[in-house]
Amino acid sequence: MHVLVRQWTVSGLLVSLVAGGVAAVALGRIAELDYRPGTGATAVLYLVASPAAFFLAAGYTEALFLAFALTAWLAARRGNWLAAALLAGGASFIRINGVFLLAALAVAALRTPGGWGTATDEERPPARPAQRIQALVTLLAALIPPAFYELYLKARTGDWLAWQHAETAGWQRKITNPVDTYRTAWTAAFGHEFSAPINFVFQLEVVAVAAGVLTVIVLAVRKRWPETVYTALTIGALATSIWYESVPRALLLLWPIWCGLAVAAARRAWVGQLYLAVSVPVAVSIGLLFMTGNWAG
């Protein structure tokens, strides 16, 4: 995009705009096909009204990642594992969460190698081991982008773990006991070390982790194992760092939350009304923090 539009900010906004449109269509399809007919538009509404939705419009990676990840999921649903692998590879090239997506796709390949949108459970013939192996081998193509990135980092820095070390140095992210992580995050959210705006952001982080854990539990109870794996890995990675950081942004990538909310609102209208009444003012606050140069997650 920068080749066509020389201004970096405008290029980033255009990429987010196009990718966001693709992601919105794909999310609507997943909600309609995998969750409940008639919930597609509502799921998209809840995504774009979420607390961290500002980052979908800004020149960040969330919209582009979702465009690749959601279309990869739709391809896997049809049993097109090559397309799913290529799209998941694109997601992996953009964010490390693409590896979590790949793990979820691997679980889906083991359970329904022919795809789960081609027939009902009763109509679908039993999967053969060869089908599962073929699907899993095909998905390995998604590892090519992160593998090349690791090779690039090794050649550039001489360190295979350069990315992890940069995360630790720049963002204080390293594997930490989740109990210690929770305590540190709680202190940051409700202590007196930071200013009120920073406290507010950390309070959102705590709520976001709670929402993520609840989503994992609900998905596991409903035996949606691929989505459970993806959500659990995403939340687990952020809940075992030094403190909770950028979790509301990570929730943007968890389509089961938005699809699940849409289903809940279809059953009980007050659920959606309450969500929007709380989320929209928070989203506006986050946008204002970002545009005034404050930390916004």
Predicted regions and their residues:
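Short acidic/glycine- and proline-prone juxtamembrane loop motifs at membrane-interface regions
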Residues: A58-L64, V247
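Membrane-lumen/periplasm interface segments of specific transmembrane helices
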Residues: L102-G212, P226-T231
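Transmembrane-helix motifs of polytopic, lipid-linked glycan transferases
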Residues: L14-D34, L214-V216
